[in-house]
Amino acid sequence: MAVVTFKGLGRRKSSTALVKLTPGSGKLVINNRKAEDYFPNKIVIQDMRQPLEVTKTASIYDINVVVNGGGFTGQAGAIRLGIARALVNMNPELKKQLKQHKLVTRDARVKERKKFGLYGARRAPQFTKR
């Protein structure tokens, strides 16, 4: 008998996460490492697990994630969206519950590019009147 897997793709800033949900005991593996070893901050892990806690499926599924690009916050946001989308693929009735907590919407904010003649995206050289 084949193991049923549900997939979800999440993106945030410059990070991309491919999430695979399989029936299991609640293990979370990120790039072949435990979540606690991969992320140094516990708050980031709690934020990432939010879709599972909202739907009360934290101990039902094992989660395997392949994530690349960006920093810890962007990767955690991408994983969070990927988990939410995988849960919706598994059970479309969960979408309403996840949408109330704003977990199925992609955060489209990205870093604004630096413009020529400026020091950053908006920081201009100091203006001298005389």
From Swiss-Prot:
GO terms for molecular function: RNA binding; structural constituent of ribosome. It comes from Mycoplasmoides gallisepticum (strain R(low / passage 15 / clone 2)). This is Small ribosomal subunit protein uS9. NCBIfam families: PRK00132.1 (NF001099). It comes from the Bacteria. Pfam families: Ribosomal_S9. Belongs to the universal ribosomal protein uS9 family. The keyword Protein biosynthesis does not apply. GO terms for cellular component: cytosolic small ribosomal subunit.
